Amino acid sequence: MKDKAYDITIIGGGPIGLFAAFYAGLRGVTVKIIESLSELGGQPAILYPEKMIYDIPAYPSLTGVELTENLIKQLNRFEDRITICLKEEVLTFDKVKGGFSIRTNKAEHFSKAIIIACGNGAFAPRTLGLESEENFADHNLFYNVHQLDQFAGQKVVICGGGDSAVDWALALEDIAESVTVVHRRDAFRAHEHSVELLTTSTVNLLTPYVPKALKGIGNLAEKLVIQKVKEDEVLELELDSLIVSFGFSTSNKNLKNWNLDYKRSSITVSPLFQTSQEGIFAIGDAAAYNGKVDLIATGFGEAPTAVNQAINYIYPDRDNRVVHSTSLID
């Protein structure tokens, strides 16, 4: 069955893509968001969910999670016009009659215009690389933490030795029943002060050990098997939740296959965010132009212009005068 053609498809479900989708909904067009990750929010939600952001207009400070929650709440006003596709990576798109055919790793989509808001490319968590890991993912195996309270009273095992792993371990110390950190080296890569706090905490530290296997029933992991580096010693750690904090890898390899003009790793755009291909626009960190400032606030400002230009491209004969939101929403 052929997928219906949406007015605008937004590639990327980070802050800029979410706001662009909201604004497109405000303008009364249909929107599809295609996001490579299993959740919306992009880097703020994934890489620094609990860290404070200070340069969002009208917010003295808010966390990455709070920013994402606010954007999704704003977006939900137009949920009848917006479709969200998660865990889909855009491979190619081609001009077809009436718009574009967009091929992902899962499906083929159709859109009258495209707005690229994928930042520096698709990014994904670095995994343990163990058999059956995917089976436990998002059940009780996590690659990032949004709500610390979900681990209350649990036996939590954290794999990793960077800032996020150490920060989560310290934050969970007084929430979880127990916290164990497994790191492949004796030395941690986190901030010195954080490491000092960790070594004097009640967190169990197992170094240098590497994960070897996961055991569980159904979608729930129950034990992590670890082995001491360069030794035969093997331990089985009982757990209620496992947090893997190996960081994220980014890739813009597909972006380079989209037959657009590029400046380094970004897409060259006009002052109206038009790419070298008519009907395709780019905003946020994905877009390159002289004087560009790579801030979330900058991308928020770019989104309405790109959406309005996309609507002008799709419906050139329509009265496309921009109306303030105070006149559009009761």
From Swiss-Prot:
The keyword Metal-binding does not apply. Keywords: FAD, Flavoprotein, NADP, Oxidoreductase. Binds 1 FAD per subunit. SUPFAM superfamilies: FAD/NAD(P)-binding domain. Disulfide bonds: none annotated. It holds the Pfam family Pyr_redox_2. GO terms for molecular function: ferredoxin-NADP+ reductase activity; flavin adenine dinucleotide binding; NADP binding. It catalyses: 2 reduced [2Fe-2S]-[ferredoxin] + NADP(+) + H(+) = 2 oxidized [2Fe-2S]-[ferredoxin] + NADPH. Its cofactor is FAD. FAD binds at residues 35, 43, 48, 90, 123, 285, 326. Its EC number is 1.18.1.2. Signal peptide: none annotated. Belongs to the ferredoxin--NADP reductase type 2 family. Homodimer. This is Ferredoxin--NADP reductase. The lineage of its organism: Bacteria, Bacillati, Bacillota, Bacilli, Lactobacillales.
